[in-house]
From Swiss-Prot:
Participates actively in the response to hyperosmotic and heat shock by preventing the aggregation of stress-denatured proteins, in association with DnaK and GrpE. It is the nucleotide exchange factor for DnaK and may function as a thermosensor. Unfolded proteins bind initially to DnaJ; upon interaction with the DnaJ-bound protein, DnaK hydrolyzes its bound ATP, resulting in the formation of a stable complex. GrpE releases ADP from DnaK; ATP binding to DnaK triggers the release of the substrate protein, thus completing the reaction cycle. Residues 1-45 are annotated as: Disordered. It is found in: Cytoplasm. Keywords: Chaperone, Cytoplasm, Stress response. Its main location: cytoplasm. This is Protein GrpE. Belongs to the GrpE family. One of its GO terms (molecular function) is protein homodimerization activity. Gene3D superfamilies: 3.90.20.20, Head domain of nucleotide exchange factor GrpE. GO terms for biological process: protein folding. PROSITE patterns: GRPE.
Amino acid sequence: MSEEKLTQDPTAEEEQTETADQQESADVNWEQEAAHWKAQAEEHQNRMLRTMADMENLRRRVRKEQEDLAKYASQKVVEELLPILDNFERALAADKESMTVESLLTGVDMVYRQMVQVFDKEGLVAIAAKGQPFDPHVHQAVMQTQDPAFESGVVVEELQKGYMFKDRVVRPAMVKVNE
């Protein structure tokens, strides 16, 4: 019987060793699997943090661009008005004794035309008033009159020009309206 025990013991011992090896191998596999998933999670977290930082940088850049756009929005118009300013300065620097009323009026007319060109180019348009039906969106009635030459509700006189910039009223025309 002791021989039987000896014979059985090596087999049992081998089985225990195999079981221990399998257990150890399974533990190693789980550890490797856990390490793999931990690395994946860290990589995803790092990617998420970089994306969040990129989004914040984008927000800052867009905010800065919007501020700059608002700050320098009128730069183009200012650049176009500079030659007009130069012409006024030249007129003021001209010899006053040799200047005639006619030459002064000619110079002012030239500057006026130059200014109108700049405004036209930018989209500023005078609002039609006299003889037009009164429109509260573009006209501001400051006086009323009774003139048989005009129909009721028609603008008789323009007291101050009104202007539209593209599709917005910048200043309504001040008008006298027929009752």
